[in-house]
UniProtKB/Swiss-Prot annotation:
CDD domains, per the entry: NAD_bind_Shikimate_DH (cd01065)
Organism, scientific name: Afipia carboxidovorans (strain ATCC 49405 / DSM 1227 / KCTC 32145 / OM5)
PANTHER family: BIFUNCTIONAL 3-DEHYDROQUINATE DEHYDRATASE_SHIKIMATE DEHYDROGENASE, CHLOROPLASTIC, SHIKIMATE DEHYDROGENASE
Name used for this protein in its record: Shikimate dehydrogenase (NADP(+))
Self-association state and partner proteins as the record states: Homodimer.
Keyword set, alphabetical order: Amino-acid biosynthesis, Aromatic amino acid biosynthesis, NADP, Oxidoreductase
BP term (GO), one: amino acid biosynthetic process
Residues at which NADP(+) binds: 128-132, 217, 240
GO CC annotations, alphabetized: cytosol
Pathway, per record: Metabolic intermediate biosynthesis; chorismate biosynthesis; chorismate from D-erythrose 4-phosphate and phosphoenolpyruvate: step 4/7
Enzyme Commission code: 1.1.1.25
Top-level taxonomy: Bacteria, Pseudomonadati, Pseudomonadota, Alphaproteobacteria, Hyphomicrobiales
Catalytic activity: shikimate + NADP(+) = 3-dehydroshikimate + NADPH + H(+)
Keyword flag Cell wall biogenesis/degradation: no
A molecular-function term among this protein's GO annotations: NADP binding
Length: 277
């Protein structure tokens, strides 16, 4: 590894990532002489790249599409990475390559910061059953949420996600959503519905309780129709950009030894980049 601690983002493609903006901001803010780079690595070349990560001068890495599952297999994963089935953060300890999934911490950290009155002792409805949903469900289980209703078009995929958690996670269909919403203290959209270029999420926020919290993992656009409607009702909301920022905290801490803060100034910087792009 180089004397200057350096981390990278590995993906294919990877040029669209905002991670360099986030980590370079923290390096400068904390006065750390480090660096963060982008590495575009084809799937076929990924195993060799990981095997030579330290030799290339890196103290760790973020991993994005399509490498997250392979990163899990090529490292020593923690409980979060194993539960989610994917690793997005790699780091060295005692010359061994370890991995975690910081989406779990990112989701919960953003929820705590953006919707401070959300309650972990209340039921939750999670929409979608992909990789993001796995991180959300594991995070909610860690925090003690008693029951999670998992809604997905493919019941089989939802059942595979729910199975390890027993009765605490139940599978529901989209036809069940209207009956579930009035009982839920938290609703989380992990699907691409509402994203730029995608249809909006068909969810009636009028059915939610006045003390409910609505989280949307989409961050382009910053304010989805779902979050706009929820805020219009006076409900607490948490957006996808907040999760992106909070999930970066743990990786930075593992690589550079300092735990950074998600500040309004950092958020404004990334928001400006999203607007330009």
């Amino acid at each position: 590894m180089s004397e200057t601690p350096t981390a990278c983002l590995i993906g294919w493609p990877a040029a669209h990532s905002r991670s360099p903006i986030i980590h370079k901001y923290w390096l400068k803010e904390l006065g750390i002489a480090g660096d963060y780079r982008i590495e575009a690595v084809e799937p076929a070349a990924f195993p060799d790249f990981i095997a030579s990560l330290a030799a290339r001068g890196y103290c760790g890495a973020n991993v994005t599409i399509p490498h997250k599952e392979k990163a899990l297999a090529l490292s020593l994963p923690d409980a979060r990475a194993r539960a989610v089935g994917a690793a997005n953060t790699l780091y060295f300890r005692d010359d061994k390559l370890h991995s975690t999934n910081t989406d779990v911490e990112g989701f919960i950290g953003n929820l705590d910061a953006s919707a401070q009155r959300w309650r972990a002792d209340d039921d939750a409805v999670v929409l979608g059953a992909g990789g993001s949903a796995r991180a959300v469900v594991f995070g909610l289980i860690e925090r003690g949420v008693p029951r999670i209703h998992l809604v997905n078009r493919s019941r089989e995929r939802a059942q595979a996600l729910a199975q390890p958690y027993g009765e605490r996670v139940s599978v529901a269909s989209w036809d069940d959503v209207e009956s579930l919403l009035p009982k839920a203290g938290l609703v989380v959209n992990t699907t691409s519905l509402g994203m730029k270029g995608q249809p909006p999420l068909p969810l009636d926020v009028a059915l939610l309780r006045a003390d409910a919290t609505v989280a949307d993992l989409v961050y382009v656009p910053l304010r989805t129709e779902l979050l706009t409607a929820a805020a219009g009702r006076g409900l607490q909301t948490a957006d996808g950009l907040g999760m992106l920022l909070h999930q970066a905290v743990r990786g930075f801490e593992l690589w550079f030894g300092r735990r950074p803060q998600v500040s309004p100034a950092l958020r404004a910087l990334v928001e400006a980049d999203l607007t330009v792009k």
